[in-house]
Amino acid sequence: MMELLVVSLSLALAFFALLDGWYLVRVPCAVLRARLLQPRVRDLLAEQLYAGRVLPSDLDLLLHMNNARYLREADVARAAHLTRCGVLGALRDLGAHTVLAASCARYRRSLRLFEPFEVHTRLLGWDDRAFYLEARFVSLRDGFVCALLRFRQHVLGTSPDRVVQHLCKRRVEPPELPEDLKHWITYNETSSQLLRAESGLSDRKDQ
């Protein structure tokens, strides 16, 4: 019995010491909670909320929430969002999946220790290759938007149009993308062209 306990504790210690253990636990839990315990969201463009709180493990040397933590919290919220609106299920039905191809973050005000916040996630639209999502970190103390993140979720194995059509049972025209998002997409395309030219891969497309 004691040997089993030691082995179990050793495996748990190795899991959290060698891997990003809490992340690997939280994402599946968020997906299962969204699938089993929360109602389905029929409106693809509806905003969804994911609650959080700044913990000691989230802090940087200035005792603010580490900038990298915003991306991780947004990742968990995005997984729950895509589950509730049915996108992940549709991708699975079509034998496809998505990968994060690009992201950008704008930090407006620090989140401090134990400060409660919500991640407001919404789908902004899609093109022939990717979905575009936004995550806003809103402080529950005063409603201030502390950070704004944008994501390009590239679809592999099918197209965003087919995913939406599978969900809605009809063809749906994508909404007009915000002007600032269009500029970001242009930046990504220009950056890709420059990097491909530097690598001698001008005919190869990025994700």
UniProtKB/Swiss-Prot annotation:
Residues 1-21 form the signal peptide. One of its GO terms (cellular component) is extracellular region. The modification Phosphoserine is found at S199. It comes from the Eukaryota. Keywords: Glycoprotein, Phosphoprotein, Secreted, Signal. Disulfide bonds: none annotated. Glycans are attached at N188. InterPro entries: HotDog_dom_sf, THEM6_lcsJ_thioesterase. It is found in: Secreted. It holds the Pfam family 4HBT_2. Belongs to the THEM6 family. This is Protein THEM6. It comes from Rattus norvegicus. The gene is Them6.
